[in-house]
Amino acid sequence: MYLRPDEVARVLEKVGFTVDVVTQKAYGYRRGENYVYVNREARMGRTALVIHPTLKERSSTLAEPASDIKTCDHYQQFPLYLAGERHEHYGIPHGFSSRVALERYLNGLFGEAS
């Protein structure tokens, strides 16, 4: 079982991310230059954390993504996905089964909070 979106949000806040935007579909979180989204539609949590596409390669050494991409018009801080029928913003979705695993991933990807 994966962490629910609200649980992912709590871990992000614990490691120093702050809420930037709240929409019907997503929470946007910022820490310095780093930006992530919590997919509020991920009821089972498999795609609850969405990272910027430029982090895909570095992230792959830390965790397997849930799928190649996740598109959503609410991910305004991320680039547009132009290959689809509708041009929406996109990121790389991940799911985590424990808070410890998510914290380890975030610290590996973004470094420890200062």
Curated annotation (Swiss-Prot):
Q: Which Pfam families match?
A: DUF2002
Regions crossing the membrane: none
Gene3D superfamilies attached to this UniProt entry: Protein of unknown function DUF2002 (3.90.1150.40)
Q: Which NCBIfam families match?
A: PRK10556.1-2 (NF007844), PRK10556.1-3 (NF007845), PRK10556.1-4 (NF007846)
Q: What is this protein called?
A: Uncharacterized protein YgaC
Q: Which organism is it from?
A: Escherichia coli (strain K12)
